[in-house]
Amino acid sequence: MNEISTIVDGDRMTSLQIAEITGKAHKDIMRAIRNMEPAWEKVQERKFALMQEEIEISNGGHKMRPYYSLNKEECLYIATKFNDEARAKLIKRWKE
């Protein structure tokens, strides 16, 4: 999963990176973000940045994989859903 860190620059973090850092499944991170987005949008008047990347699948074909690209504020908002250890890992990553 080393390619994940190259998706965005240091000012943003992807849902893929969040999954890797916290040890959670990416689909669970995506679900948490989708569930929290309506409240965020109501207060901040903007949605999270939903992106896609093309990935190769086992049969040699390709498919598009969705992911979110979040700034620090958005990322820390999402982290409120995590357990203490996962949240601490995410905060540590932002300090690096």
Segments predicted by a language model, with ranges:
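An anion-engaging/catalytic patch
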Residues: M1-E96
